[in-house]
């Protein structure tokens, strides 16, 4: 799939609640570019009913090489889930990663439970 400036590169994510076996819907995600000492907030979004964002977090001309950080606001999500307690163990989960090829697809899934998480570079 080609986007805005002809490059197919994009950044996407998907959040799954492994405790419930369902997508983590309405989970807030902030995307930062890391340069120097002050992270720059690029965007904030929420996951849809499928645990995905409605649009790529980066694509086309916004897809630059560099270091980025996704901050998943798991505490908000876990605290509002009906079957969870009022004080979740996890709060904001930062995942820092690098983009070396602006024409590549970078997919950063998050598998989330009340007491742990895992991630990997997906496809």
From Swiss-Prot:
Keywords, in A-Z order: Hydrolase, Plasmid, Purine metabolism
* Keyword Nuclease attached: no
Report the EC number(s), separated by commas if there are several: 3.5.2.17
Which molecular-function annotation in GO is an example for this chain? hydroxyisourate hydrolase activity
- Keyword presence, Hydrolase: yes
Which transformation does this protein catalyse, written as a reaction? 5-hydroxyisourate + H2O = 5-hydroxy-2-oxo-4-ureido-2,5-dihydro-1H-imidazole-5-carboxylate + H(+)
Residues bound to substrate: 14, 52, 120
Q: Name one Pfam family in it.
A: Transthyretin
Biological process (GO), any one: purine nucleobase metabolic process
InterPro entries associated with the record: Hydroxyisourate_hydrolase, Thyroxine_BS, Transthyretin/HIU_hydrolase, Transthyretin/HIU_hydrolase_d, Transthyretin/HIU_hydrolase_sf, Transthyretin_CS
Give the top-level enzyme category. Answer: hydrolase
Q: What does this protein do?
A: Catalyzes the hydrolysis of 5-hydroxyisourate (HIU) to 2-oxo-4-hydroxy-4-carboxy-5-ureidoimidazoline (OHCU).
Other remarks on record? Answer: HIU hydrolysis also occurs spontaneously, but more slowly.
Q: Which family does it belong to?
A: Belongs to the transthyretin family. 5-hydroxyisourate hydrolase subfamily.
Summarize the subunit comment.
Homotetramer.
Name-wise, this protein is: 5-hydroxyisourate hydrolase 1
UniProt organism field: Rhizobium meliloti (strain 1021)
